[in-house]
Amino acid sequence: VRAASCEIWVPTQAPEAAQQEAARLLGIPAESVQVNITMLGGGFGRRLQVDYVLEAVEIGKAAGKPVQVLWTRDDDMKHGFFHAAKIEHLRAGLDAAGKPVAWLHKSCGPDLSVLGLPSEEDRKNPNFYSDDGMPWGLFDNPYNFAHQAGDFVPVQSPVPTGPWRAVMYPSTVFARESFVDEIAHASSVDPLELRLRLLEPGDVLDLKIAKVDRARLIAVLRLAAAKSGWPALLKQDAGRLWGRGVACNIYAEDCYLAQVAEVSVSKDLTDLRVHRIVSAVDCGLALNPLGIEGQTESAIAWGMSAALGGKINFKNAQAQERSYADFKVLRMDRAPKVETYLLQGSDMPGGFGETAVPTVAPAIANAIFSATGKRVRRLPISFS
């Protein structure tokens, strides 16, 4: 930091914001702030925030010399921005023959203001949430119900929340795909078969700001089912209960994915193992198939970490977890076999960094029900 300029070296996903906020803090023009972007490491949306940049700028200004600011893991766990907690409420109506004909999905939680959205102008528009399609996973519900409605109720959180890998999709897709399974059970229909029926006639759903190609979702569902061996029974043994679950989603209009999870649960419900996750993918023209496989594997590890142990506890307004010793993430000895199958499309290539995250939790939860008859309606998964 100099009298009339500033140079920053930083791993950031938002260099423009870093430049503008540093300039505002120092009272100098934005063009007098040079931001050099280093290798990012794991960003996952956290580095869209620039709080750590401003900390370095303030210290550098006070010190009057170049400084390097490093956060410990403890700092990172306690002073980061957390994935927003949400509540999802769903209802469905069946006709006399057991066919689903009505759907209601209400979602409640912090909105995208964590990204600087919506703008002040958008906030004055009473139709903003429907017109701009928030939250994801609710407004772009692919299933074909004769009558359906969705609503999003934004609330302020006392906890600082921020972007998370797949942003708003995970909670809404977990609720939606779990509830479709509940409808299947109530209708005495195979969960995969019900999804295929609800996606007929395989048309394109035009939502004005996005389009959902149901035929592409049908294709990945059928591929995932075929590669996983659905609906053949899994092996059973004396001490464990085995089950298989399915979930699917469209990510940001241009990526279609279906997953089948295979799990086993000890009969005393104290030990859950995820043995295999099969993914079928259509993200248009796949320019880097190996990259898609790698992103699928990392997304599954991310989704499993969140589904099985991703929890922050607060006491006196302070996060209690301080390291990976008490914040549990997936370990290698618990990692499942991952299989990724690609449908090579001709559409424009779609981004795939987050696509495989939202379906992991519902696929596992639905597999748990298949094995034990117990529904999972809360994350992280717990039998207590």
Give short role names for the model-derived ranges.
Residues V1-S384:
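Cofactor-binding beta-sheet edge motifs in enzyme active sites
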